[in-house]
Amino acid sequence: LVDSHVHINEPGRTEWEGFNTATQAAAAGGITALVDMPLNCIPVTTTKAAFAEKLAAVDDKLWVDRGFWGGVIPQNIADLDDLLNAGVLGVKSFLIDSGIAEFPNVAAKDIRAAMPILAKHDVPYLIHAELDCGGFNHAVINEKYNSFLASRPKKWENDAIALMVEMARESKAKGDDC
């Protein structure tokens, strides 16, 4: 059983969670492999050097198999070949603010530049599919889940999916929303 969407946060933010505890918990729950997301760690996994640092951080801390997603941000398009050749399984981007300053969201021009590289490597492109199309959403989030849902207009997701379908058709790259 593989959990392909895990934020382990190591190196750099082990007070949130590190590989030792995350993989022990996974093993206790019957998970045999985790695939770590590229953000919430320091540095974010957007370059070959950052990926090497991530690999060094997991040494002797794994209780299950592991894999890693790299990240696509506006500043690393030229580094994608090296990152993919280093062994990440694919890449992830946000179309909206990720909440992490070191992992800014991409625009259509960044996606358009990245997708041919991803197609060449035949790897998936995971997209956080919310596209803020302007206008501020004034919904108040409280302890009710429905209040969170109200803060995320359906149009944001619909527009993001439409953009990614268009980009995937243009480039023949694989895409997925997450």
Question: Over which residues does each language-model region extend?
Answer:
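Hydrophobic faces of well-ordered beta-strands that scaffold small-molecule active sites
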Residues: 2-6, 34-36, 66-70, 91-93, ...
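Short, surface-exposed connector motifs at secondary-structure boundaries
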Residues: 31-34, 60-65, 167-177
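Histidine/acidic residue-rich metal-binding segments in metalloenzymes
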Residues: 78-93, 98-178
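Class I S-adenosyl-L-methionine
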Residues: 23, 75-79
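Alpha-helix-loop-beta-strand connector modules within alpha/beta enzyme cores
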Residues: 47-65, 110-127
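Metal-associated gating/positioning segment near the N- to mid-region
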Residues: 1-61
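Active-site mouth loops of central-metabolism enzymes
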Residues: 4-17, 40, 45, 64-76, ...
